[in-house]
């Protein structure tokens, strides 16, 4: 029994470490997209040099940190469920968490698509739209952390209202930042 508990704690620790790495990669990746997009509207020499550098940085960040962290997050998360499936698979908060994780995985792959579009100069989004895209990952982080920490003590009505309030607050902050920059 001690080995199972110790094994679970190690798996849980690794899961948390790779969640942190995954989110760090997603946050920084979209930040690179914003800089990359802004560089694409600059003078030709600057655009060429900076775009090439951003492409290298994006490629390394995506394939060395972000995507492996996603895979390991899912692997260790699934391992935790296997080790304690009697508990996790009966918990409503876990079902909702898994839904958010699925949406986060879709966000991950759409972010990869954005990377290819921006590198081919086909992305039609503005830097402000990319900032809003970046805040969506923040919403996933807030939702997942609150679900895991508060579990069933969370009043779902307050949780839902709070989730949308955070989203609205982030949108307002991005809009204010845009006005401040102008």
Regions found by a protein language model. Give the residues of each.
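Polytopic transmembrane helical bundles with strong interfacial aromatic enrichment
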Residues: 2-182
